[in-house]
């Protein structure tokens, strides 16, 4: 895929293997596993831990130099083979071709005019690499015994990909040969490039991603070399950190949830050819047709011959795109930053505020989001801030006053302020909080803009600085908006403007406008680093309205996530990383792996 696939294709690994004994390598692997499985560092020590883990990984990589084996040639040499295989499998092959789009990398180009909502691409199940196909492969015996593989389908897909790459008779070779040999995810950043992200909201996820990948690699290196059920895997002689990093990134940037053959549940899959499509703003136009057992994609808009065909990956922030897709999307209509807010349990009015929030379906403590759009806060955050700033009298009115239950419906509605004083307090709070968050960055926005003008800036540094700047611009927007709102409501108060009064008949107005939906009817997504994308979330705006089609988002469930396990001798080897819900609407807690 596009920007995610700016790569330097490597030649086959024919260099001499570094002189290292199996025992020496196993000792290094054990040291890495121990380091990555230790307790989380104390606050402020995460970077130090990252540097230490990275030093161990680099030591291992140096000793593994020349051991990785990849395909001779460059990616485009194999595109014709991919198309021929697709035709053989009865996938769609007409109306488009794979083409290079400069800064966006490879993508699909229309070879004829395509109308909006026209079905132009379908991929049958037989072409997909799935957790189910992994179970039926050489990886099956190990899968049946290993708790990590059973808990983490993404890891299963990564090892499945490596095993098939090493199998000269694999049916998926035409696909695997066209995958990038490197990616632009932070796993490929140099230490100094990662340093640009220090003090950003993204840094913790970046450091966790690296630590978890290193831990998984060390664990599976031991498993591959010691577990009886791994004896037939074609990885024993060549399973390097670079191999695993490549497989993780390939899966992280491409995996999707599709239904199993019987439709009873979902499974993870890599979808050849379709995953060449690059991202743009829009709507989900891909779904899985259970009746025909294939992935189907309709055109997002009208495309003229020669134009690039895009798909919509979902409502992801640029932090998600950078961390899990390896690119920064300049025109991201869904960009946002996280803001953690909560009512202090030591506050005198805590019980009353918590009760009002509970009635509105909002936790007393949660991670919300500030958006790049106008307004910068959603209905959920507005409701939280109103309750957060309520006086005891106002709280009592929403608990036991006239129409108290119905008034809960107005908390997220801009047309029904609690009071002018409440509005002034909440916007003052937001303005102050955003300003404080801005002070945590080590550079000013103008400094970032100046750095981006340097012609010798590396691609990864450019991506990191763009993300850092975008975070600040969203916070600056929140400060500006908060100030303007504060002044507006102060003027209303000073002029004695009448407060809009809620009447019971207004409930019809609230229920007939999506932007004014009662908070209690909207799902508040709590970002506790565990977002899972639901495949059955079709909106009325989605093109695939057929109930037999399940929407598909490219690269969803990005991280190699799973439940935390304690493999034999490994300690807490696998930590569950953040999962995101790219398809969620403007719900709080949206933040979550890159491209083609």
Curated annotation (Swiss-Prot):
Binding positions (S-adenosyl-L-methionine): 75, 104-106, 254, 275-279, 325-327
Main location, first listed in the record: cytoplasm
Catalysis: reaction(s): L-histidyl-[protein] + S-adenosyl-L-methionine = N(tele)-methyl-L-histidyl-[protein] + S-adenosyl-L-homocysteine + H(+)
GO molecular function terms noted in the UniProt entry: actin binding; histone H3K36 methyltransferase activity; histone H3K4 methyltransferase activity; protein-L-histidine N-tele-methyltransferase activity; transcription coactivator activity
Subcellular location: Cytoplasm
Signal peptide region: none
Example of a GO cellular component annotation carried by this entry: cytoplasm
Residue segments, region Disordered: 556-596
Keyword Lipid metabolism: no
Keywords: Actin-binding, Cytoplasm, Methyltransferase, S-adenosyl-L-methionine, Transferase
Basic and acidic residues: bias regions: 575-596
The SET domain, residue ranges: 94-314
CDD domains: SET_SETD3
Pfam families, alphabetized: Rubis-subs-bind, SET
Domain comment, as recorded: The SET domain specifically recognizes and binds actin, suggesting that it does not accommodate substrates diverging from actin.
Family in the record: Belongs to the class V-like SAM-binding methyltransferase superfamily. SETD3 actin-histidine methyltransferase family.
Function text: Protein-histidine N-methyltransferase that specifically mediates 3-methylhistidine (tele-methylhistidine) methylation of actin at 'His-73'. Does not have protein-lysine N-methyltransferase activity and probably only catalyzes histidine methylation of actin.
UniProt protein name: Actin-histidine N-methyltransferase
Gene from which this protein is expressed: setd3
């Amino acid at each position: 895929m596009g920007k995610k696939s700016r790569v330097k294709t490597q030649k086959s690994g024919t260099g001499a293997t570094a002189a290292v004994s199996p025992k020496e390598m196993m000792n290094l692997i054990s040291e890495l596993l121990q380091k990555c499985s230790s307790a989380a560092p104390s606050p402020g020590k995460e970077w130090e831990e990252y540097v230490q883990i990275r030093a161990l990984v680099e030591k291992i990589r140096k000793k593994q130099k020349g051991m990785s084996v990849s395909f001779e040639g460059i990616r485009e040499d194999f595109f014709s083979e991919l198309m021929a295989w697709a035709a053989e499998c009865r996938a769609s092959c007409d109306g488009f071709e794979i083409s290079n789009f400069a800064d966006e990398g490879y993508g699909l180009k229309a070879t004829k005019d395509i109308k909006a909502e026209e079905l132009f691409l379908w991929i049958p199940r037989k072409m997909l690499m799935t957790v189910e196909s992994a179970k039926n492969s050489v990886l099956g015996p190990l899968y049946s015994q290993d708790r990590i593989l059973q808990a983490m389908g993404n890891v299963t897909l990564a090892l499945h990909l490596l095993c098939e790459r090493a199998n000269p008779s694999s049916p998926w070779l035409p696909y695997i040969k066209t995958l990038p040999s490197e990616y632009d995810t932070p796993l490929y950043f140099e230490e100094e490039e990662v340093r640009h992200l220090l003090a950003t909201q993204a840094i913790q996820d970046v450091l966790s991603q690296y630590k978890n990948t290193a831990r998984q690699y060390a664990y599976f290196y031991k498993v591959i070399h010691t577990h009886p059920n791994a004896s037939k895997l074609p990885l024993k002689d060549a399973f390097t950190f670079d191999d695993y990093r490549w497989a993780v990134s390939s899966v992280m940037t491409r995996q999707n949830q599709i239904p199993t053959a019987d439709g009873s549940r979902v499974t993870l899959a890599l979808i050849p050819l379709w995953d060449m499509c690059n991202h743009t703003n829009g709507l989900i136009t891909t779904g899985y047709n259970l009746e025909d057992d294939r992935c189907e994609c309709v055109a997002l808009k009208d495309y003229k011959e020669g134009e690039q065909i895009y798909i919509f990956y979902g409502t992801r922030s640029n932090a998600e795109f950078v961390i899990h897709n390896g690119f920064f999307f300049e025109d991201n209509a869904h960009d946002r930053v996280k803001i953690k807010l909560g009512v202090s349990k030591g506050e005198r009015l805590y019980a009353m505020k918590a009760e009002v929030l509970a009635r509105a379906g909002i936790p007393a403590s949660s991670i919300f989001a500030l958006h790049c759009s106008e307004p910068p806060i959603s209905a959920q955050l507005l409701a939280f801030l109103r309750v957060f700033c309520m006086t005891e009298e106002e709280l009592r009115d929403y608990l036991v006053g006239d129409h108290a239950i119905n008034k809960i419906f107005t908390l997220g509605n801009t047309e029904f302020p609690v009071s002018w004083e409440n509005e002034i307090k909440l916007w003052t709070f937001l303005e102050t909080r955003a300003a404080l968050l801005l002070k945590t960055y080590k550079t000013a926005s103008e400094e970032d803009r100046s750095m981006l003008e340097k012609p010798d800036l590396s691609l990864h540094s450019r991506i990191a600085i763009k993300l850092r700047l975008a975070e600040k611009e969203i916070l600056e927007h929140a400060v500006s908006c908060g100030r303007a709102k504060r002044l507006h409501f102060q003027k209303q108060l000073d002029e004695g403007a009448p407060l809009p009064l809620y009447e019971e008949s207004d409930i019809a107005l609230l229920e007939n406008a999506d932007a004014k939906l009662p908070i209690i009817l909207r799902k508040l997504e709590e970002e506790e680093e565990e977002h899972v994308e639901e495949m059955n979330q079709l909106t009325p705006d989605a093109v695939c309205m057929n109930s037999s089609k399940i929407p598909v988002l490219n690269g969803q469930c990005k991280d190699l996530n799973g439940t935390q396990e304690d493999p034999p001798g490994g300690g807490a080897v696998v930590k569950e990383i953040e999962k995101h819900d790219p398809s969620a609407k403007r719900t709080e807690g949206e933040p979550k792996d890159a491209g083609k």
